[in-house]
Amino acid sequence: MKQCTRQCILIIDFGSQYTQLLLRRIRELGIYAKVCDWNISQDLLVSLNPNGIIFSGGPDSVTNKHSSSISKVVFKIGVPILGICYGMQILVSQCGGNIRSVSNKGEFGYAQVEILSQKNTLIGNLYDYINDQGHCVLEVWMSHKDIVETMPQGFTVIGITENQQIAIIINEKCRWYGIQFHPEVTHTKKGKDILKRFAVDICRCEVTWKPVYIVKNIIKTIKKVVGQDRVVLAFSGGIDSLVTALLLKYAINHEQFVCVFVNNGLLCCNEINRISNFCKKYQDLNIIHLSEEKRFLSALTGVIDPEEKRKIIGKIFVEIFQAQISQLKNIKWLAQGTIYSDVIESGMSCASANIIKSHHNVGGFPSSVNIQLLEPIKDLFKDEVRNIGLYLGLPLNVVNQYPCPGPGMAIRILGEVREEYCNILRRVDYIFMEELNKSDLYNTVDQAFAVFLPVQSVGVQGDQRKYKWVIVLRAIETEDFMTAQWVRLPYTFLNKVSNRIVNEVEEVSRVVYDISCKPPATIEWE
């Protein structure tokens, strides 16, 4: 199997809640990192050709005979390995040491690790303070109930906890390292320094995960795999598809590339204006506009189940693109703005080492439609896509535009979707967005939108009681849309928005604010 020559740290995931955070911490260093499941195949491991490997934490215990383990091949490819928490226990166990479960002596939360020797490549001269005994100490974050009972041959204990449990081990000859704490969380003050020491100093990774290099590599890859073939892009107007369109524009000839934008009647507030402005700026792009509002809204009549709504919308999109591919002739590739969080949530975080997947049955396409899927930005998180957008010249207000979900307002209108509900929601959303901008709050929030509830609440207009619709406002802050916190918007701001909505949108009598985090709630309501 052909090897990938790109500089890479491979994170082998054992189910830790912090794996995606660990990935981000490595990328923040300017180093490309990728996550794969613990049962990674030998062929895929070799093809990725990593500079170094990190074993993540995880909920298992290596003392359980059914626990996750790792192929012995990983230890034979000659690259540095860093085991974190459960990953350290995997390292110890599979190198011949012994792990013991001590449920009453587990270590959780904030802890101090005493450094026994500074003469090592991983944490030499890294510490937070010197204790009364003159020993260097690291302040760290732990979450484990198993401990190292016997050390494997060739390893040295470098750090211990207050409970005299082994916390840092090193095999300098093999360049294998284990730490019982989590360097990826902010509670471990020197965590980022430790990860940098491993990735840069030990693994010798070059700092190349920057927009200029990312764009260069993506364009090079598109040129190589597409060649002279024709490509159609499913163009939604969101930041992901905007960036994908520009990358294709710079990678292949104008005649090879067509964008298809479908107005399904479910577009979020200002989507049409944003797309129109983009088209005016990049007039050399071939963008086909299709008005299919009635087709989508008609198909959604009477449908209340959110999954059924998604399926209907997806099915119609497939039918539309199938027809377009047939009309445009000689289309070999369907391009999409899939990003890394989409890949993770689909359970395919390491399904391929490349940005290309060949399919004869993509997204519900009939097997007779021979089309391949092109996903140029599937290795990027949302914030990385935005940085690429800025690098490619997109205006800041476009780059920071809140994302609109694929099904659009269909999943922001609970229950049946009607045209009148869409119009109400757009007017409400416009007020919400306008006030966020006026109050200089827009760029302090990562996502904000309104939700239409199919329930009526009593209100008073003039001297009359009337039952009208209820609207939910939602605003969240997040780094990667994998987890999210609700935003504490000022009460005066919420009061102003609420007053405007109930006064300017006569169909609404009540406005409520969503204070749910993800998890357990999702960002969208459906």
From Swiss-Prot:
Top-level EC class as recorded in UniProt: ligase
GO cellular component: cytosol
EC code(s) of this entry: 6.3.5.2
Catalytic residue positions: 85 (nucleophile), 182, 184
Function: Catalyzes the synthesis of GMP from XMP.
PANTHER family: GMP SYNTHASE [GLUTAMINE-HYDROLYZING] (PTHR11922:SF2), GMP SYNTHASE-RELATED (PTHR11922)
Protein name as annotated: GMP synthase [glutamine-hydrolyzing]
Source species: Blochmanniella floridana
Gene that produces this protein: guaA
